[in-house]
Amino acid sequence: MKYDYLVVGSGLYGAIFAHEAKAHGKSVLVVDKRPNIAGNIYTENIEGINVHKYGAHIFHTNNKKVWNYITRFAEFNRFTNSPVANYKGELYSLPFNMYTFNKMWGVVTPEEAAAKIEEQRREITHEPQNLEEQAISLVGRDIYEKLIKGYTEKQWGRDCKDLPTFIIKRLPVRLTFDNNYFNALYQGIPIGGYTKMIANLLDGIEVRLNTDYLKNKAALDALADKIVYTGPIDAYFDYKLGTLEYRSVRFENELLDKPSFQGNAAVNYTDRETPWTRIIEHKWFEFGKDENGNDLPKTIISREYSSEWKPGDEPYYPVNDAKNGALYAEYKKLADTEPKVIFGGRLGEYKYYDMDQVIAAVLDRCESELH
């Protein structure tokens, strides 16, 4: 059988494109090299807990069209991201807000907090030359030393004095008692996990798992009139112009026979000495309860480590610097010469996308492609 579309990758971009194509009467085949659907938003149910296997994914958006679309495929809970920072046993609220400043300096009013930050910012009197100076010029030395320096150095594997200023363009400072990390109208986690949501999108569509498109390209290409490719763009072209760089993350998962480990979904470890950057406790994304509302007796934590990416590792975050941007632009020119192929998603477009941005991008693409 010849399909109208072959969709490579069953993550958010691929699943939505496949769903929309089918809704427009097109025949679709989805292939994925992993043994499961859902790409990096894959959640696995272990002991009643939906574990975010490729790192925490918290849905947030101000885009009503996107929200109305995705909530057709899942009911979302009211989870609000309120991370905690642990600096050598001292706990601080994130993002930086009045709870943070009260703990740091004992200040009680927004006026006192603003004055303290202003006083500390004055340490940098010249144009910041590196990330350390940039951060101090924005929020002062105390917050930098305790809540930014160690965490950032672990994330990037470099000293803050050797990192460019553009990594921290701005640091949100809230002079209110507000722990809600995302200032978004809509926020939450799909009840029952993301995998269930992707399964709903792919309902009635043929999916072949454990199928590596790039290793079987000619045979798979022959099956369809057009290809939607959501894998790494440089891999598609066999890295012939060079390798695009990513930041990678490594997870150590642990099942614990107790009801709670840290009492919060995310705790960032902001000192340099603790090797992990943060610990995720997955059950709190769904308030510690199973799908029937019962308390879960066990818990699962994931220690997260930043790691230097090398070819073959799982690509997580594109490194959007000038060098990689220029290389992507060259690959994009090659992609434009492939009229049968649509390149989409975080890897296909080498773009740091939040989930709502992926949804908006694929719906736009469907609009132009399928109508």
PLM features: what roles do these ranges have?
Residues L12-Y13, P35-N36, Y99, E153, ...:
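Short, solvent-exposed loop/turn segments at secondary-structure junctions
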Residues A56-E90:
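N-terminal FAD cofactor-binding segment of flavoenzymes
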Residues Y3-V30, C366, L370:
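N-terminal Rossmann-like FAD-binding beta1-loop-alpha1 element of flavoenzymes
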Residues A85-S93, M98-K226, T230, A235-F237:
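Active-site/ligand-binding neighborhood in enzyme catalytic cores
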Residues E314-H371:
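C-terminal catalytic lobe of FAD-dependent flavoproteins
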